[in-house]
A protein has these predicted regions:
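A recurrent flexible, glycine/aromatic-enriched loop bordering the glycosyltransferase active site
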Residues: 186-187, 243-265, 269, 280
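A conserved acidic beta->alpha catalytic loop
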Residues: 153-163, 181, 205, 209
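Glycine-rich, basic loop-to-helix element that forms the pyrophosphate-binding segment
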Residues: 179-196, 246
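Structural preference for alpha-helix termini/caps and helix-kink/transition segments
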Residues: 2-116
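Short aromatic/hydrophobic "clamp" motif used to bind/position activated sugar donors
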Residues: 201
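C-terminal, non-catalytic tails of nucleotide-sugar-dependent glycosyltransferases
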Residues: 101-114, 228-232, 237-238, 261, ...
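Conserved donor NDP-sugar-binding/catalytic core segment of glycosyltransferases
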Residues: 209-244
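Short, acidic, metal-binding catalytic loop of nucleotide-sugar glycosyltransferases
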Residues: 136-146
Length: 360
């Protein structure tokens, strides 16, 4: 749908296709939305502009069109008369900065040699103060390492995009990719992975704040070729059904994505994140198993200097929404990995589907 909207098809053809799609989606696109209403002052301006056009004073009419555009309106001149509508959030964003609609539009640098020590990747799903705190934590604790921070503005409408543009001017090591709509958690992070130029990648959540030197420890851990993923908050499970936050140090079955680090070269080995995970929950577990499937370890160290703040993606939803989205994502994980107890640490690990014990 998004590719069609952004295509070179005539407007009428796009509208016909959207209405046909909407027979399935049920969004009532054929009904004029209240957002398309214009203020009485705009209606008066259109009448004055129409008078200029009738008198062939097109210079004055064009000047008024430009003013209406600056005020946030699209003016449409047709044989039946002139109409105007407010610009959509998408149109307003596209006027401010270049944006993408999917990770497929992003060039991958993964086949090119690393140019830096570290790449931070942040999926910015809104909440500007959280994003600012997270970025400052990254950039204030780089030590002697060369770093870049890739922040994906994931369709935000709360001023996050504007904040990121301001921070770009202050931080040359910051790179920003704007998305014209919410593309999902995995797709957003894949943009960062594909664009990364650091030897090691650190994926952070906006709720996490770095408060000290984490990069020396990460570099040391990832110098071990047997370690695939390293981070502070490890998980364990005996049966693929319940992952417990109880691994403070050493090997774990999975790592929570509040902070997870891995070598950039391994992305070509294990693949990108699965973009069927639009909601964040269980994506981290799924990606860890992509590493474990290649014989790589997941290692935890809870002493890393990070603080977890309120996780907005969790608290902004009610219990029903959280449970439904989490359940669907866990089903995606189980469908792929549920019968792979051989990837778990426990000697008597049990697969979800067969519930047959596997012995290492």
């Amino acid at each position: 749908t998004w590719e069609m909207v952004r295509s070179e098809l005539p407007g009428r053809a796009k509208m016909d296709l959207l209405l046909e799609f909407d027979e399935i989606f049920g969004l009532d696109l054929d009904k004029s939305a209240a957002e398309n209403a214009v203020a009485s002052g705009i209606t008066k301006t259109l009448e004055v502009r129409g008078g200029h056009r009738e008198q062939s004073d097109y210079a004055a009419a064009d000047e008024m069109r430009g003013q209406l555009a600056s005020d946030g309106y699209i003016v449409l001149d047709t044989a039946a008369g002139t109409r105007a509508r407010p610009k959509t959030p998408l149109e307003l964003r596209q006027e401010k900065w270049a944006s993408v609609s999917s990770s497929r539009e992003i060039e991958s640098y993964l086949d090119q040699p690393a140019e830096l020590d570290f790449t931070f990747v942040l999926n910015a799903y809104g909440y500007p103060s959280d994003v600012k705190r997270c970025i400052e934590g990254m950039l204030n604790h780089t030590g002697s390492h060369s770093v870049e921070a890739i922040v994906i503005d994931n369709g935000s409408t709360d001023g996050t995009g504007e904040l990121l543009e301001e921070m770009l001017a202050e931080h040359p090591e910051l790179r920003v990719v704007h998305c014209d709509h919410v593309i999902g958690d995995a797709a957003s992070k894949n943009i960062g992975l594909k664009q990364s130029r650091g030897r090691n990648i650190v994926v952070l959540d906006g709720s996490a704040e770095i408060t000290g030197n984490i990069l020396d420890t990460i570099a040391e851990q990832l110098s071990d070729p047997t370690v695939g993923i390293f981070g502070p908050w490890g998980l364990s499970t005996p049966d693929m059904q319940h992952f417990h936050e109880e691994v403070d140090s050493g090997d774990a079955d999975a790592m929570q994505a509040y902070c997870m680090a891995f070598r950039r070269e391994e992305v070509n080995n294990v693949g990108l994140m699965r973009e069927c995970f639009r909601f964040y929950r269980n994506l981290d577990i799924d990606y860890c198993f992509q590493f474990k499937d290649k014989g790589l370890r997941v290692v935890a160290d809870s002493s890393l200097p990070l603080v977890r703040h309120e996780h907005r993606q969790w608290t902004e939803l009610d219990d029903t929404q959280r449970d439904e989205l989490s359940r669907k994502n866990f089903g995606r994980f189980l469908k792929r990995w549920g019968n792979r107890p051989d990837l778990l640490l426990a000697a008597d690990a049990v697969g979800f589907e067969s519930h047959q014990q596997f012995h290492h």
